[in-house]
Amino acid sequence: MILRPFHLAIPVDDIEAAKEFYGLKLGFVEGRSDDHWIDFNFFGHQLVCHIGESISFSNEVDGKDVPIPHFGIVLDWKEFDIFSETIKSNNIDFIIEPYLR
């Protein structure tokens, strides 16, 4: 089976803050952008941050209040460990720290 890249657009309230978080703290390469949106290479997929309102609620999973909407990437063990340690070292305030299910 061939995995095909996906496009995911999410709302943000500040493009510069999104650029700092996704680009600098998470290390995603910035692609195209405009005044109201910016896209990033999310492990070969396209993550686009658009200025817009967010609707948020949570659902209990593994005893944690998991925000909805949310998204993630499935990594092998070594990639997960490396990425997890990298983002933990960037002083990010997590809603839920990276963990394995």
Describe the function of each predicted region.
Residues 3-7, 66-70:
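Short, solvent-exposed beta-strand edge segments and adjacent coil->beta transition regions
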Residues 15-16, 71-101:
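Vicinal oxygen chelate
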